[in-house]
């Protein structure tokens, strides 16, 4: 039995979530808690980002993207951004 990963949201990700429709907020939170937190290896569900976002991981949920840092030593998934796929990669 693997240990569960903790999911935390930084201030920017919380602000991003608040801008979204309540239904998609619920879906994102459920996805992170039920799928990613319980995964033995959360990398299996995501994709590593490159270039200016190197070191971050991306999860897809419908047309939305969840950008995270994985801190393996702490078993922590830190969500740093959430948004629609058309805008999430803009800086």
Task: List where the protein language model places each region.
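Enriched for short, Lys/Arg-rich terminal
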Residues: 1-11, 15-19, 23-26, 30, ...
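A short, surface-exposed loop/turn module that caps and links secondary-structure elements
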Residues: 34-58
């Amino acid at each position: 039995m693997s240990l569960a990963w903790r999911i935390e949201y930084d201030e920017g990700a919380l602000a991003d979530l608040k801008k979204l429709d309540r239904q998609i907020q619920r879906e994102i939170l459920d996805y992170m808690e039920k799928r990613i937190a319980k995964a033995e290896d959360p990398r299996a569900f995501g994709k590593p980002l490159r270039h200016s976002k190197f070191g971050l991981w991306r999860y897809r949920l419908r047309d939305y993207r969840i950008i995270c840092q994985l801190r393996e030593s702490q078993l922590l998934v830190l969500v740093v951004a959430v948004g629609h796929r058309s805008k999430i990669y803009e800086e």
